[in-house]
Amino acid sequence: WCLGGFRLAFAIGAEPLIAALRQVKGVVDFNQSLALQQGAIQALTRWADWPRSLHGMYRERRDRVLSVLRGGGWSCPTPGMAMYVWLPLPADAGVRKLGDETFASHVLQRSGIALTPGSGFGEGGKGWLRMALVRPTDELEDAARRVVSAVP
């Protein structure tokens, strides 16, 4: 339902655990508004099949972007299903030496395409870049071509 960034969820458990969770949530993300919660309930109850309709769209976007990147020499894993793809830094020793943050900045400056450095997601993300698949497919293919052309 494209609500991932809103961090909506529910918890069932013993009252002491739920009370502790409330304390943490109140400090960490201030909970969610009632309007957003009601909207999520409507999405879950009225459009239960809608996410399935997105699978084909994101699969096509993923496949076309990966085709362009792989055609340009990138070695990218194929995610099962996600709104993004993960790109390892190119094998070139000079690029790998730059690291994901500097290389993402380089790509942005040369191509105008913003890739998220994987190190922002923790130690396991170092050496990787994340490319979101949230634009129309033709725009994503163009973005992938521009990323390929930005590699020295």
List each model region and its residues.
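PLP-dependent class I/II
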Residues: 1-152
